[in-house]
């Protein structure tokens, strides 16, 4: 049973129709009621099993149905994953997300996945996985291993969904989110802007997310990364203001959720990213690649953080952990005032 006011489609549509500056002002006010506006949660995403996915998501280069030039790779060894997690922590990430390109994990994969979760948790990092659909037993096993978050995006509205994916139903996605929640794992779920959807579809996606019995703790909003060989490779570019508007509406509708500026940042300039942060985005993926698509280099993100006076959320540093992490955090928390970018002047 819902424990929060339910949104209606007309209410969401009204938000999308608001003048942009009024919308941004409202979103920023709500954001400041629940979060420190200078804090950004930083995550790193690693593909632990790449390509050869049997599903037909039209945006995805990892689908075996499309010729994108992506070479399939087997599951990474546990120690390889843990080494990547160490590097992510040393670079400033507080959450380590792991994705596998399959429809759902098999039972024989579960001990491997549990071992990875336990190993990453032991470093003091939050853990997140995106593995496709889960059954009740798998969700509970991951919870028992210590998994903090599970990502399973809804992608778009229920009405537009069938134009993008046919190998998994919308209800199956909702069912997986329910199983994850019942197992005690926090939910990470969002969608993609630029699939060819209408504004009403964007409203419908956010309506589904906000009206879950408990809204997702983390809401990634992706800008479509067009990959040659996928059916959406020739889609029109997303207007930057339309994307910023979607971020702002997500913040207003889900005031206590982290809204993550996810895929597509590589094609955004600094001004667009700054306006997304003004609109209420307070989380990013950090690192040069998101699964298989480009992402801004770490140094570029650090420069942007310094210009905007943003600080990465503090990680839980274990006793005796290396000092590089602490030095990096101190560097990031010292704004470059000579080059400060005044986001409020946008």
Curated annotation (Swiss-Prot):
The gene is bioB. Keywords: 2Fe-2S, 4Fe-4S, Biotin biosynthesis, Iron, Iron-sulfur, Metal-binding, S-adenosyl-L-methionine, Transferase. Its EC number is 2.8.1.6. Catalyzes the conversion of dethiobiotin (DTB) to biotin by the insertion of a sulfur atom into dethiobiotin via a radical-based mechanism. It comes from the Bacteria. It comes from Salmonella arizonae (strain ATCC BAA-731 / CDC346-86 / RSK2980). Pfam families: BATS, Radical_SAM. [2Fe-2S] cluster binds at residues 97, 128, 188, 260. InterPro entries: Aldolase_TIM, BATS_dom, Biotin_synth/BioAB, Biotin_synthase, Elp3/MiaA/NifB-like_rSAM, rSAM. Belongs to the radical SAM superfamily. Biotin synthase family. The lineage of its organism: Bacteria, Pseudomonadati, Pseudomonadota, Gammaproteobacteria, Enterobacterales. Homodimer. [4Fe-4S] cluster binds at residues 53, 57, 60. PANTHER family: BIOTIN SYNTHASE, BIOTIN SYNTHASE, MITOCHONDRIAL. Residues 38-256 form the Radical SAM core domain. SMART domains: BATS, Elp3. It is an enzyme of class 2 (transferase). Pathway: Cofactor biosynthesis; biotin biosynthesis; biotin from 7,8-diaminononanoate: step 2/2. Binds 1 [4Fe-4S] cluster. The cluster is coordinated with 3 cysteines and an exchangeable S-adenosyl-L-methionine. One of its GO terms (biological process) is biotin biosynthetic process. This is Biotin synthase. It catalyses: (4R,5S)-dethiobiotin + (sulfur carrier)-SH + 2 reduced [2Fe-2S]-[ferredoxin] + 2 S-adenosyl-L-methionine = (sulfur carrier)-H + biotin + 2 5'-deoxyadenosine + 2 L-methionine + 2 oxidized [2Fe-2S]-[ferredoxin]. GO terms for molecular function: 2 iron, 2 sulfur cluster binding; 4 iron, 4 sulfur cluster binding; biotin synthase activity; iron ion binding. Its cofactor is [4Fe-4S] cluster; [2Fe-2S] cluster. NCBIfam families: bioB.
């Amino acid at each position: 049973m819902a424990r929060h006011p339910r949104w209606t489609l007309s209410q969401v549509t009204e938000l999308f129709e608001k003048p942009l500056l009024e919308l941004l002002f409202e979103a920023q006010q709500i954001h400041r009621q629940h979060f420190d506006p200078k804090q950004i949660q930083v995550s790193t995403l690693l593909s632990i099993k790449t390509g050869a996915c049997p599903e037909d998501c039209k945006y995805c280069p990892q689908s075996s149905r499309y010729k994108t030039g992506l070479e399939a790779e087997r599951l990474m060894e546990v120690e390889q994953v843990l080494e990547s997690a160490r590097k992510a922590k040393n670079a400033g990430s507080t959450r380590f997300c792991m994705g596998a390109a399959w429809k759902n994990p098999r039972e024989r994969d579960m001990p491997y996945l549990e071992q990875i979760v336990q190993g990453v948790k032991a470093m003091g990092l939050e853990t997140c996985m995106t593995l496709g659909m889960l059954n009740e037993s798998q969700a509970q096993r991951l919870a028992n291993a210590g998994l903090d978050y599970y990502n399973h995006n809804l992608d778009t509205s229920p009405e537009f969904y069938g134009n993008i994916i046919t190998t998994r139903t919308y209800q199956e996605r909702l069912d997986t989110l329910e199983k994850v929640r019942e197992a005690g794992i926090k939910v990470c779920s969002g969608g993609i802007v630029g699939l060819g959807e209408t504004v009403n579809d964007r409203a419908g996606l956010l309506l589904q997310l906000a009206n879950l019995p408990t809204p997702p703790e983390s809401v990634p909003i992706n800008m479509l990364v067009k990959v040659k060989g996928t059916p959406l490779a020739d889609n029109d570019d997303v207007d930057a203001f339309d994307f910023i508007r979607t971020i702002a509406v997500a913040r207003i509708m889900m005031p206590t959720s982290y809204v993550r500026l996810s895929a597509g940042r590589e094609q955004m300039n600094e001004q667009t990213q700054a306006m997304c942060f003004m609109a209420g985005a307070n989380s990013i993926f950090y690192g040069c690649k998101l699964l298989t698509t480009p992402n801004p280099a770490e140094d570029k993100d650090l420069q942007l953080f310094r210009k905007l006076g943003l600080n990465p959320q503090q990680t839980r540093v274990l006793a005796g952990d290396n000092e590089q992490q602490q030095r990096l955090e101190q560097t990031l928390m010292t704004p470059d005032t000579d080059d400060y970018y005044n986001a409020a002047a946008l």
